[in-house]
Protein backbone atom coordinates (compact mmCIF):
# COMPACT_ATOMS: atom_id res chain seq x y z
CA UNK A 1 0.00 0.00 0.00
CA UNK A 2 2.92 2.35 -0.66
CA UNK A 3 1.59 3.78 -3.92
CA UNK A 4 -0.41 6.99 -4.19
CA UNK A 5 -4.12 6.39 -3.76
CA UNK A 6 -6.73 7.64 -6.24
CA UNK A 7 -10.49 7.47 -5.87
CA UNK A 8 -12.81 6.51 -8.73
CA UNK A 9 -16.46 7.48 -8.24
CA UNK A 10 -19.35 6.57 -10.53
CA UNK A 11 -23.10 6.27 -10.91
CA UNK A 12 -22.96 2.59 -11.89
CA UNK A 13 -26.25 0.71 -11.73
CA UNK A 14 -27.42 -2.83 -12.43
CA UNK A 15 -25.30 -5.98 -12.30
CA UNK A 16 -23.59 -6.67 -15.62
CA UNK A 17 -22.07 -10.07 -16.41
CA UNK A 18 -18.67 -10.13 -18.17
CA UNK A 19 -20.38 -10.98 -21.47
CA UNK A 20 -22.65 -7.94 -21.15
CA UNK A 21 -25.80 -9.83 -20.20
CA UNK A 22 -27.80 -8.56 -17.22
CA UNK A 23 -27.69 -10.37 -13.89
CA UNK A 24 -29.86 -7.55 -12.55
CA UNK A 25 -31.13 -4.64 -14.62
CA UNK A 26 -30.11 -1.05 -14.07
CA UNK A 27 -32.56 1.84 -14.15
CA UNK A 28 -31.28 3.06 -17.54
CA UNK A 29 -28.56 2.64 -20.16
CA UNK A 30 -26.59 5.62 -18.85
CA UNK A 31 -25.18 3.75 -15.88
CA UNK A 32 -25.13 0.23 -17.32
CA UNK A 33 -21.64 0.21 -18.85
CA UNK A 34 -19.76 2.83 -16.79
CA UNK A 35 -18.16 0.04 -14.78
CA UNK A 36 -16.05 -0.68 -17.87
CA UNK A 37 -14.70 2.88 -17.73
CA UNK A 38 -13.91 2.42 -14.05
CA UNK A 39 -12.07 -0.83 -14.78
CA UNK A 40 -9.99 0.81 -17.51
CA UNK A 41 -9.07 3.72 -15.25
CA UNK A 42 -8.29 1.41 -12.33
CA UNK A 43 -6.00 -0.77 -14.43
CA UNK A 44 -4.21 2.34 -15.67
CA UNK A 45 -3.64 3.60 -12.13
CA UNK A 46 -2.31 0.19 -11.08
CA UNK A 47 -0.02 -0.05 -14.11
CA UNK A 48 1.58 3.23 -13.07
CA UNK A 49 2.16 2.26 -9.46
CA UNK A 50 -0.90 3.92 -7.97
CA UNK A 51 -3.63 2.29 -5.87
CA UNK A 52 -7.23 2.72 -7.09
CA UNK A 53 -10.25 2.86 -4.79
CA UNK A 54 -13.85 2.90 -6.08
CA UNK A 55 -17.19 4.13 -4.75
CA UNK A 56 -20.70 4.40 -6.17
CA UNK A 57 -23.87 6.48 -6.00
CA UNK A 58 -26.33 5.22 -8.61
CA UNK A 59 -28.89 7.41 -10.35
CA UNK A 60 -32.56 7.23 -11.46
CA UNK A 61 -34.15 7.97 -14.84
CA UNK A 62 -37.06 10.25 -15.70
CA UNK A 63 -38.02 7.73 -18.37
CA UNK A 64 -39.15 5.42 -15.57
CA UNK A 65 -40.80 8.02 -13.34
CA UNK A 66 -42.67 10.27 -15.80
CA UNK A 67 -46.24 10.69 -14.62
CA UNK A 68 -45.52 9.34 -11.13
CA UNK A 69 -44.52 10.76 -7.76
CA UNK A 70 -40.97 9.65 -8.55
CA UNK A 71 -40.56 12.79 -10.65
CA UNK A 72 -40.56 14.78 -7.40
CA UNK A 73 -37.13 13.27 -6.73
CA UNK A 74 -35.65 14.17 -10.11
CA UNK A 75 -34.12 17.58 -9.42
CA UNK A 76 -33.58 16.94 -5.70
CA UNK A 77 -31.49 13.87 -6.53
CA UNK A 78 -28.66 15.99 -7.94
CA UNK A 79 -28.02 17.83 -4.71
CA UNK A 80 -28.52 14.72 -2.57
CA UNK A 81 -26.11 12.65 -4.67
CA UNK A 82 -23.55 15.47 -4.77
CA UNK A 83 -23.56 15.53 -0.97
CA UNK A 84 -22.99 11.76 -0.80
CA UNK A 85 -20.22 11.91 -3.43
CA UNK A 86 -18.46 14.60 -1.41
CA UNK A 87 -18.84 12.55 1.75
CA UNK A 88 -17.27 9.59 -0.05
CA UNK A 89 -14.38 11.81 -1.15
CA UNK A 90 -13.77 13.04 2.39
CA UNK A 91 -14.13 9.51 3.73
CA UNK A 92 -10.93 8.47 1.95
CA UNK A 93 -8.52 11.03 3.45
CA UNK A 94 -5.49 9.40 1.81
CA UNK A 95 -6.75 9.98 -1.76
CA UNK A 96 -4.49 12.11 -3.93
CA UNK A 97 -7.07 12.77 -6.63
CA UNK A 98 -10.58 11.90 -7.78
CA UNK A 99 -11.78 10.55 -11.13
CA UNK A 100 -15.55 10.79 -11.58
CA UNK A 101 -17.54 8.76 -14.11
CA UNK A 102 -21.13 9.81 -14.86
CA UNK A 103 -23.45 10.06 -17.83
CA UNK A 104 -26.96 11.38 -17.45
CA UNK A 105 -28.96 14.44 -16.49
CA UNK A 106 -28.95 13.77 -12.75
CA UNK A 107 -25.81 11.76 -12.05
CA UNK A 108 -23.49 13.92 -14.13
CA UNK A 109 -24.52 17.29 -12.60
CA UNK A 110 -24.22 15.63 -9.18
CA UNK A 111 -20.70 14.48 -10.01
CA UNK A 112 -19.78 17.95 -11.30
CA UNK A 113 -21.04 19.52 -8.08
CA UNK A 114 -18.98 17.07 -6.05
CA UNK A 115 -15.80 17.67 -8.05
CA UNK A 116 -16.30 21.43 -7.99
CA UNK A 117 -16.80 21.11 -4.24
CA UNK A 118 -13.33 19.57 -3.92
CA UNK A 119 -11.23 22.61 -4.86
CA UNK A 120 -8.04 21.44 -3.18
CA UNK A 121 -7.86 18.08 -4.98
CA UNK A 122 -6.84 17.14 -8.51
CA UNK A 123 -10.04 15.94 -10.20
CA UNK A 124 -11.17 14.86 -13.65
CA UNK A 125 -14.49 13.78 -15.14
CA UNK A 126 -15.01 10.90 -17.57
CA UNK A 127 -18.40 11.33 -19.30
CA UNK A 128 -20.28 8.09 -19.85
CA UNK A 129 -21.02 8.92 -23.49
CA UNK A 130 -24.15 8.22 -25.51
CA UNK A 131 -26.21 5.28 -26.66
CA UNK A 132 -26.48 4.73 -30.40
CA UNK A 133 -29.52 5.27 -32.59
CA UNK A 134 -31.56 2.26 -33.61
CA UNK A 135 -32.56 1.49 -37.18
CA UNK A 136 -36.25 1.93 -37.98
CA UNK A 137 -37.00 3.49 -34.60
CA UNK A 138 -37.54 6.85 -32.94
CA UNK A 139 -34.68 8.45 -31.02
CA UNK A 140 -34.69 8.98 -27.27
CA UNK A 141 -35.94 12.53 -27.72
CA UNK A 142 -38.99 11.69 -29.79
CA UNK A 143 -40.02 8.70 -27.67
CA UNK A 144 -40.55 11.06 -24.76
CA UNK A 145 -43.64 12.33 -26.58
CA UNK A 146 -45.19 8.86 -26.94
CA UNK A 147 -47.50 9.26 -23.94
CA UNK A 148 -48.87 12.54 -25.29
CA UNK A 149 -49.25 11.16 -28.80
CA UNK A 150 -51.03 8.08 -27.45
CA UNK A 151 -53.37 10.24 -25.37
CA UNK A 152 -54.18 12.23 -28.53
CA UNK A 153 -54.75 8.95 -30.41
CA UNK A 154 -51.92 9.73 -32.82
CA UNK A 155 -50.24 6.35 -32.22
CA UNK A 156 -51.43 2.93 -31.08
CA UNK A 157 -50.39 1.33 -27.81
CA UNK A 158 -48.54 -1.33 -29.79
CA UNK A 159 -46.54 1.30 -31.70
CA UNK A 160 -45.71 3.18 -28.50
CA UNK A 161 -44.49 -0.01 -26.82
CA UNK A 162 -42.37 -1.00 -29.82
CA UNK A 163 -40.75 2.43 -30.19
CA UNK A 164 -40.05 2.63 -26.47
CA UNK A 165 -38.26 -0.71 -26.57
CA UNK A 166 -36.23 0.17 -29.68
CA UNK A 167 -35.12 3.69 -28.73
CA UNK A 168 -31.69 2.67 -27.43
CA UNK A 169 -29.61 1.02 -30.13
CA UNK A 170 -26.80 0.01 -27.79
CA UNK A 171 -26.74 -1.12 -24.15
CA UNK A 172 -24.88 1.82 -22.62
CA UNK A 173 -24.68 5.59 -22.71
CA UNK A 174 -27.04 8.51 -22.25
CA UNK A 175 -29.78 9.85 -24.53
CA UNK A 176 -28.43 10.67 -27.97
CA UNK A 177 -30.23 14.02 -28.37
CA UNK A 178 -29.01 17.33 -26.89
CA UNK A 179 -31.08 17.16 -23.73
CA UNK A 180 -29.78 17.73 -20.23
CA UNK A 181 -27.60 14.62 -20.24
CA UNK A 182 -25.71 15.36 -23.45
CA UNK A 183 -25.61 19.08 -22.69
CA UNK A 184 -24.10 18.38 -19.27
CA UNK A 185 -21.33 16.35 -20.90
CA UNK A 186 -20.58 19.21 -23.29
CA UNK A 187 -20.63 21.80 -20.49
CA UNK A 188 -18.28 19.63 -18.42
CA UNK A 189 -15.82 19.58 -21.30
CA UNK A 190 -16.20 23.34 -21.80
CA UNK A 191 -15.42 23.87 -18.11
CA UNK A 192 -12.14 22.03 -18.60
CA UNK A 193 -13.05 19.20 -16.24
CA UNK A 194 -12.77 16.53 -18.97
CA UNK A 195 -10.12 15.86 -21.55
CA UNK A 196 -10.66 17.55 -24.95
CA UNK A 197 -13.29 15.69 -27.01
CA UNK A 198 -14.38 13.86 -23.86
CA UNK A 199 -18.11 14.44 -24.29
CA UNK A 200 -20.54 12.20 -26.17
CA UNK A 201 -18.31 9.27 -27.14
CA UNK A 202 -20.35 6.19 -28.15
CA UNK A 203 -20.62 3.96 -25.08
CA UNK A 204 -18.65 0.75 -25.47
CA UNK A 205 -16.51 2.01 -28.37
CA UNK A 206 -12.71 1.83 -28.35
CA UNK A 207 -12.42 5.63 -28.21
CA UNK A 208 -14.71 5.62 -25.17
CA UNK A 209 -12.50 3.18 -23.26
CA UNK A 210 -9.40 5.07 -24.35
CA UNK A 211 -10.87 8.21 -22.80
CA UNK A 212 -10.92 6.49 -19.40
CA UNK A 213 -7.31 5.38 -19.79
CA UNK A 214 -6.11 8.82 -20.85
CA UNK A 215 -8.13 10.51 -18.11
CA UNK A 216 -6.44 8.37 -15.47
CA UNK A 217 -3.05 9.30 -16.93
CA UNK A 218 -4.06 12.97 -16.94
CA UNK A 219 -5.10 12.80 -13.29
CA UNK A 220 -1.73 11.32 -12.39
CA UNK A 221 -0.08 14.25 -14.16
CA UNK A 222 -2.35 16.78 -12.45
CA UNK A 223 -1.38 15.35 -9.07
CA UNK A 224 2.30 15.39 -9.97
CA UNK A 225 2.06 19.04 -11.04
CA UNK A 226 0.03 20.05 -8.00
CA UNK A 227 -2.87 21.23 -10.18
CA UNK A 228 -6.22 21.13 -8.41
CA UNK A 229 -9.86 21.82 -9.28
CA UNK A 230 -9.37 25.37 -8.01
CA UNK A 231 -6.90 25.93 -10.86
CA UNK A 232 -9.25 24.49 -13.49
CA UNK A 233 -12.51 26.16 -12.49
CA UNK A 234 -11.98 29.85 -13.11
CA UNK A 235 -13.94 32.83 -14.38
CA UNK A 236 -12.59 32.07 -17.85
CA UNK A 237 -13.63 28.41 -17.79
CA UNK A 238 -17.11 29.31 -16.58
CA UNK A 239 -17.36 31.95 -19.32
CA UNK A 240 -16.30 29.31 -21.85
CA UNK A 241 -19.03 26.95 -20.63
CA UNK A 242 -21.66 29.70 -20.74
CA UNK A 243 -20.73 30.63 -24.31
CA UNK A 244 -20.76 26.97 -25.36
CA UNK A 245 -24.17 26.43 -23.76
CA UNK A 246 -25.60 29.59 -25.30
Name the predicted role of every residue range.
Residues 1-246:
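Metallocofactor- and cofactor-centric catalytic cores in central/energy metabolism, strongly enriched
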Amino acid sequence: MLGKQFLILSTQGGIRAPDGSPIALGYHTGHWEVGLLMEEAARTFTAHGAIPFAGYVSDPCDGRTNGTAGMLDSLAYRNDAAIVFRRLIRSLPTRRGVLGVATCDKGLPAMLLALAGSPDLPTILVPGGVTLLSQDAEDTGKVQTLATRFAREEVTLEHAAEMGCKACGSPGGGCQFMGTAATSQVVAEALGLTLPHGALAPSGAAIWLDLARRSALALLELEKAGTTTRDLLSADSIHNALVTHA
